[in-house]
Amino acid sequence: MGKGFSFASVILSYFLVGGGMFTATLVGSELQIGTELAAYALFAAGAFAGGFVAARASRGQTILEPAIGAVAVVATIVGLAATTPIGKLIWVVAQDQTIAFVGSVGLTGVVGALVGASVSERLLGEATQSSIPWIVYTAMAAFGASLLSTLFASILFLGDNAATRSGLDIGAVVLIGMGGGCLIAGLAVGASSRVRPLLAAFLGGGLGVTGFFTLVTRATPPATSDAVTGVALLAGAGAMVTLIGTVFGGVTVGRKQAT
């Protein structure tokens, strides 16, 4: 077991489990999996992967934080759906089916994250003292945080009449989501890590942003041939923002928890 409950690890687990579940959904879409059972299995697999990694990154109770993170992810999905016109329409037209779907997704997410965290703890024990694995942890956290932050930013700036009020286009919203996601992910990494994974945070942040923008460009293919250069520049910017967040999180929270 770890050294007590860690709220920073809950935030990190939230991004890791969320990133795992959304990645599993994208994989299912690419594979054109149409059965309901297979979709739930993918949700569980994504939550398992997120919970497994979250347990390795947690400095606290290990199993508790990924479970709370999974619940928060499900709450986010419900909240985002409830704020969109299509989500409100689905709720009115098929309330019973919606409740059943949300319950099933919530159950598979929480169980998957719990099983992943339990397996991780039993096989590998407490959180690692090495900074090398934090490249993977930070990459997954930056990816998940960028994705979730962009969803929030889309609702805030593009939902309903917000687009005319904010004057922002989808590109600006994606950049806001990426920047905010990398900063929050870095803060969570710095606060949760038992080491000072500065280089790992820089590399992981860049990898996470690369994965995020690869996803974005697949959804909306760029019109120019400079996409690779653009993604590289954005990955470098994301890496720097993640590093800044990691330094600040380590100084303000991580160092206090270590003493």
Language model features with spans:
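Juxtamembrane/disordered regions of integral membrane proteins
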Residues: 1-259
